[in-house]
């Protein structure tokens, strides 16, 4: 995963010069290093003792404080990054453990359901075998009844000796 805005490289202000304070357009000539003959560089007045020396010390103090703040920010970012890395690792371990437990539980449930299904399939197979057996017995009974019925029908069509004699005597 990418880190966004974490642990940026420290910014060094020691080698950088503070931006010049520009009060008017006249001072811009000194920024371009275009000095006209007879003109005095405005930076020369900053080197004079007096109120400008306190400005130089204030600027140095501000630079130091800014550098300290940047270092503190970078340290905080590094600590945050370490904290997030530890949190991520801990979370991964917990998720992994929970996943393993869930998987084990799923397999236990699958095993239990498989046993139940196997028992029911065995019962079903036994009942189907019994139904097939009863069906065969019923077919045999039907065939026997049919045979008996046919025999009875054939016997009723064939006159017995007495019936034949009776019929012969009528004529």
UniProtKB/Swiss-Prot annotation:
GO terms for biological process: cell division; synaptonemal complex assembly. Its main location: nucleus. Disulfide bonds: none annotated. Meiotic cells (at protein level). Expressed in the ovary and testis. Residues 24-36 have a biased composition (Basic and acidic residues). GO terms for cellular component: central element; chromosome; nucleoplasm; nucleus; synaptonemal complex. Keywords: Cell cycle, Cell division, Chromosome, Coiled coil, Meiosis, Nucleus. Residues 1-52 are annotated as: Disordered. Belongs to the SYCE family. This is Synaptonemal complex central element protein 2. It comes from Mus musculus (Mouse). The lineage of its organism: Eukaryota, Metazoa, Chordata, Craniata, Vertebrata.
């Amino acid at each position: 995963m990418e880190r966004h805005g974490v642990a940026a490289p420290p910014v060094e202000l020691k080698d950088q010069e503070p931006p010049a304070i520009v009060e008017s357009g006249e001072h811009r000539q000194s920024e371009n290093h275009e000095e006209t003959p007879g003109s005095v560089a405005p930076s020369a007045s900053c080197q004079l003792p007096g109120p400008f020396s306190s400005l130089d010390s204030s600027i140095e103090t501000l630079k130091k404080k800014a550098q300290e703040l940047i270092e503190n920010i970078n340290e905080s970012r590094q600590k945050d990054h370490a904290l997030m890395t530890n949190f991520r690792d801990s979370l991964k371990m917990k998720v992994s453990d929970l996943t393993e437990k869930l998987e084990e539980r799923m397999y236990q449930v699958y095993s239990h359901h498989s046993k139940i299904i196997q028992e029911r399939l065995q019962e079903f197979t036994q009942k189907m075998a019994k139904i097939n057996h009863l069906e065969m017995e019923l077919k045999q009974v039907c065939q026997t009844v049919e045979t008996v019925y046919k025999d009875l029908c054939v016997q009723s069509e064939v006159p017995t000796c007495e019936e034949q004699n009776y019929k012969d005597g009528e004529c």
